[in-house]
Amino acid sequence: MGLCTSKPNSSNSDQTPARNSPLPASESVKPSSSSVNGEDQCVTTTNNEGKKSPFFPFYSPSPAHYFFSKKTPARSPATNSTNSTPKRFFKRPFPPPSPAKHIRAVLARRHGSVKPNSSAIPEGSEAEGGGVGLDKSFGFSKSFASKYELGDEVGRGHFGYTCAAKFKKGDNKGQQVAVKVIPKAKMTTAIAIEDVRREVKILRALSGHNNLPHFYDAYEDHDNVYIVMELCEGGELLDRILSRGGKYTEEDAKTVMIQILNVVAFCHLQGVVHRDLKPENFLFTSKEDTSQLKAIDFGLSDYVRPDERLNDIVGSAYYVAPEVLHRSYSTEADIWSVGVIVYILLCGSRPFWARTESGIFRAVLKADPSFDDPPWPLLSSEARDFVKRLLNKDPRKRLTAAQALSHPWIKDSNDAKVPMDILVFKLMRAYLRSSSLRKAALRALSKTLTVDELFYLREQFALLEPSKNGTISLENIKSALMKMATDAMKDSRIPEFLGQLSALQYRRMDFEEFCAAALSVHQLEALDRWEQHARCAYELFEKEGNRPIMIDELASELGLGPSVPVHAVLHDWLRHTDGKLSFLGFVKLLHGVSSRTIKAH
């Protein structure tokens, strides 16, 4: 939710929408003629440049997505760009793209009678009586009016608006806050009501992290819900990017990325996926260059278990991950969005661009970001590798937020601290369920890891606070997690997931075995040196773990049932000369046998 800090530009309020724009008149913006000290606020290079229209993010099933269609500070270079970064290059805006048809259908199903292509409804124009019969009582305090003095409106979206306010009394008397006002008349479906309820619950649970605005409380009366939060007065990250001519230096980009990754890692550890990360959804607390960055707009966020996949298509087109468009995603989708942000920070253009949303989606699914154009050849190889590993189209090969903070480009920065990573527990669960043969293969692979690759694993092992003899058990894991747990972690059922690590209840694991259990084969595969890793690991496996094995025995070790055509699936896993695992079989064993492999036969 955007905690906006400036009034809407009244000069645009009476302008008509751009042709074919799905936005209401009040939010379609023509080129501004205003200037500061005689200079145009927007950087222009041609007669057509400087025209800034609100970007229309693809349709969301949650009205909360539109609550904070932010109006940027009056002297910002992005004054007239209300909901998006402009065009491919940050100096050249373009008209809003058309919505994608299949996403219109999603919105239609979600909002019932509301037509998706007319969902951008100006405030106050919704039909009377929407949502009649729905229970719109949230159980929030009804004392908002007695505690706060509501001030000027500072931002407006399709389903709500934001006001500045201040405490009327108490120790905080006179202190300014941001209040997100959500009219209950806009809550026309049970899903919309539940979205608001979940947003408040998540904000309440996560509040307290350095890179999240402080959550004060939520209130309601007969007409509205009021969410009271810290007022961030430094403007959007988008504004800072534009004020710097469209890009950051590597060092400054690192400072921004560390803060973004810290809060994303925290959310993911708690089992919360944001689903709408973009420069507009990060605010600075003040105008100072060194001010803290805060993640906002949790209107689309949701709980997700480590072994769960979501299927709602939500977010903003330029930042959406490929797997979101495929309707099967988890926390990795947020990391893709972070990758798009850092790409923009370093070069000033978007990695995926088209003039229509369907074109953007095609680019996201099929195109590779360019690292050939300036300034990429002049940037460090570590910076390029960092961005590439966040923008891997295979979510299994993408870095997590904690791993990104362990990357050589970032890890030596003073503020970079590696947080606990929920991925470790997913990988440990798979390892504990593996056959003895696969465990031996993973142990061989773990012995080929480089110092940089081991850095992340050492940090994760240390966070589990091993005993004096250097081992961990299930109790170490539970204890370490509980120290960082919020109510969100309970709601995402992560403690329940840990029950699947019960094999550690009666045994302990040393660091060497932990490396085998917690390494990601898919992520190693994404490296240029993967072939070298695999060959070296196979040589070790030949000496320490490989043995003659019958196909039926191998099938049993892999847990394949009688319905699986094991000879068809596994025939090329074994060497015909001695019946031992071939190199191909070894690599496949590292991954295990997936249902996709079985179906292929």
From Swiss-Prot:
It holds the Pfam family Pkinase. Residues 452-488, 489-524, 525-564, 567-596 form the EF-hand domain. Residues 434-454 are annotated as: Calmodulin binding (CaMBD). Activated by calcium and calmodulin. Autophosphorylation may play an important role in the regulation of the kinase activity. It is an enzyme of class 2 (transferase). The active site is at 276 (proton acceptor). Its main location: membrane. Residues 1-19, 36-48 have a biased composition (Polar residues). Keywords: ATP-binding, Calcium, Kinase, Lipoprotein, Membrane, Metal-binding, Myristate, Nucleotide-binding, Phosphoprotein, Repeat, Serine/threonine-protein kinase, Transferase. This is CDPK-related kinase 5. It comes from Arabidopsis thaliana (Mouse-ear cress). The lineage of its organism: Eukaryota, Viridiplantae, Streptophyta, Embryophyta, Tracheophyta.
